[in-house]
Amino acid sequence: MNVIDLFSGCGGFSKGFLDENFRILGAIENFKPVVKTYLYNIKAPVWMDDIKRIPPKAFDEFIKNEKVDVIIGSPPCEPFTKANKLIKDNPLDRLYKDKVGRLVLYYIDYVNYFTQRNDDLIFVMENVPQIKEIKDELKKLFGDIGHKVYFNILRAEDYGNPSKRARMFISNIKLKPKKVDKLVVVEEALKDIPKDAKNHEIKKLSKEKVEMISKLKWGEALYRYRGKKKLMFNWYKLHPKKLAPTVKGRSRFIHPYEDRLLTVREQARLMSYPDDFVFFGGRDVQYNQIGESVPPILGRAIAKEIKKQL
């Protein structure tokens, strides 16, 4: 079963499908360090460019015109998330007037093109739950190309992810993966990391910063910032017996037992990445790749559901 991944990021979504023995034909991603991460771990070809400059027909040729069974992908969520204090007030403006929001339309163009080549195509588009504010418009756009769509909100922690993460998965099938019996908490996620693991370098902090974070209790944060409608937190001290909060691109977490930030590897553990999944780019770029991805364990749960349909 063949998959293409649009707006692939570092490859968390693709990794989940690989783990269920799907074949990744190719991906589109436009940021070089992220592409390097994807190529190293997923080992599938990537067209590195802005999707606006890649017509579906050209990408079809790039993957040698092979049959596409599944399209996955995660158009940028910034235009739709309330964490963005510059989010446009009119929901439709987020789709049509925000140049980043318009990337969703390119995803739909790809679905349209590959549907014409395979009537049984399945697609899954990931975004933040707030994208439901343009639900009717998305129903119309997908309906115009022959697809009834379902708006599936899935919580990654229900499938074994150690951090909370509610996301919308818009698809032409209902997605109801089997949930795990027991949640995975921070302490369990962070244990037994080999000292020589990749991406496991500890960031040196100033004495003043160490003193500040030493005074924090579990569940407290050093910094706060204003989202569109609510206060957001960063440098959050993790509670060892609970789930971690949602991992975002700029999220930084404090170790529950040590006065330091989590390493990139530890943060990747919170998003269910295996230790042999290596991240490239500067440290901030690595953190960002993790926070902007679909946890592989959730991607795999979705892949299992799709297998039933195919």
UniProtKB/Swiss-Prot annotation:
Gene Ontology terms: biological process: DNA restriction-modification system; methylation; negative regulation of gene expression via chromosomal CpG island methylation
Gene3D superfamilies attached here? DNA Methylase, subunit A, domain 2 (3.90.120.10), Vaccinia Virus protein VP39 (3.40.50.150)
Presence of the UniProt keyword Transferase in the record:
yes
Record EC number: 2.1.1.37
Q: What class of enzyme is it?
A: transferase
Q: Which reaction does it catalyse?
A: a 2'-deoxycytidine in DNA + S-adenosyl-L-methionine = a 5-methyl-2'-deoxycytidine in DNA + S-adenosyl-L-homocysteine + H(+)
SUPFAM superfamilies assigned to the protein according to its UniProt record, in alphabetical order: S-adenosyl-L-methionine-dependent methyltransferases
Q: Which GO terms describe its molecular function?
A: DNA (cytosine-5-)-methyltransferase activity; DNA binding
**PANTHER family listed in its UniProt record:** CYTOSINE-SPECIFIC METHYLTRANSFERASE (PTHR10629), DNA (CYTOSINE-5)-METHYLTRANSFERASE 1 (PTHR10629:SF52)
Regarding protein family, the annotation reads:
Belongs to the class I-like SAM-binding methyltransferase superfamily. C5-methyltransferase family.
Q: What does this protein do?
A: A putative methylase that may protect DNA from cleavage by an unknown endonuclease.
Name used for this protein in its record: Putative type II methyltransferase M.MJ0563P
State the organism named in the record.
Methanocaldococcus jannaschii (strain ATCC 43067 / DSM 2661 / JAL-1 / JCM 10045 / NBRC 100440) (Methanococcus jannaschii)
